Amino acid sequence: MSALGFPKTPSDKKALEEGAVFSPRFDPAGLVTVVVTDAEDGMLLMVAHMNAQALALTLETGIAHYWSRSRNALWKKGETSGNFQHVVEMRTDCDQDALWLRVKVLGHDATCHTGRRSCFYRTVGLVDGKGTLVDDGSKPLFDAEFTYRKPSS
Amino acid sequence: MSALGFPKTPSDKKALEEGAVFSPRFDPAGLVTVVVTDAEDGMLLMVAHMNAQALALTLETGIAHYWSRSRNALWKKGETSGNFQHVVEMRTDCDQDALWLRVKVLGHDATCHTGRRSCFYRTVGLVDGKGTLVDDGSKPLFDAEFTYRKPSS
């Protein structure tokens, strides 16, 4: 566990938006939204969430930790795949309910669980009045099926 | 109102992650998270949310519409400031619960309600064991106080 805590949201809007005190606004589930981009070329890699513990560990270790909403568990990104995220810079937005991590991805330089570099590999458009996705052709950088296989019982 | 609807999330994971049908996964509040970057230089401008209506209007008009969680209302970004967002490209992520808009900002080329170009104008770091924000010095591009003033009664 980390000892690092975060102060409550100030009631003064100016303090929240222009101040120097980091007081992240966690949602009712205790999470903030995190946008993750590549520090070198700015590519959007993923959108994830952090609770206070994941955020504290990220600040203290410089390695990105998240809260997995699907597994309901703390998630040190890269623990299985080796694709850890080294945090080059963290930013927050005007009302401190979102974070931006600029990272260097280790391992295969892949962030998506499908093996691709980015989770955003499909464009959205309207075709005959229906929302339609087009794959941008980006290829897996590692064998996700092998990496994330479950141990046989 | 828009007539455009969105199909339910497929139960098949492969269809969700690799398919061509756009089936955005709205959260229990009916929203998806939207990351907005500048189409030209990739700068992260803001994080916002869309409900189905805002998403449909965005796809149909090519101008970004959001759902304002603070005002509980549909929000055509730029309606007050003139800083509309023209959508150059929309993408979705592997499990279709987040969207990425690459936009050209009209008007003052400013996205933040403080008048700055981006909402992410402060870095986060640890100073003496406390989360501390440092302003990056980006200046307002329009007079937010004047633009968003309330009409006197």
UniProtKB/Swiss-Prot annotation, chains A, B:
The reaction(s) catalysed by this protein are: 1-(5-phospho-beta-D-ribosyl)-5'-AMP + H2O = 1-(5-phospho-beta-D-ribosyl)-5-[(5-phospho-beta-D-ribosylamino)methylideneamino]imidazole-4-carboxamide
Cofactor binding note of this UniProt entry: Binds 1 Mg(2+) ion per subunit.
- Gene Ontology MF terms in the entry: magnesium ion binding; phosphoribosyl-AMP cyclohydrolase activity; zinc ion binding
| Enzymatic class | hydrolase
Q: Give the location in the cell.
A: Cytoplasm
Its BP terms in the Gene Ontology are: L-histidine biosynthetic process
Q: Name its co-factor(s).
A: Mg(2+); Zn(2+)
Q: Where does Mg(2+) bind?
A: 93, 95, 97
Give the binding site residues for Zn(2+). Answer: 94, 112, 119
**Which InterPro entries does the protein's record reference?**
PRA-CH, PRib_AMP_CycHydrolase_dom, PRib_AMP_CycHydrolase_sf
The protein's matches in Pfam families, at most eight in alphabetical order, are given as: PRA-CH (PF01502)
> What EC identifiers does the entry list?
3.5.4.19
- The main place the protein resides is cytoplasm
Family to which this protein belongs? Belongs to the PRA-CH family.
Q: How does it assemble?
A: Homodimer.
Q: What function does this protein fulfil? A: Catalyzes the hydrolysis of the adenine ring of phosphoribosyl-AMP.
- Name of the protein described by the UniProt record: Phosphoribosyl-AMP cyclohydrolase
Organism, as annotated: Mesorhizobium japonicum (strain LMG 29417 / CECT 9101 / MAFF 303099) (Mesorhizobium loti (strain MAFF 303099))
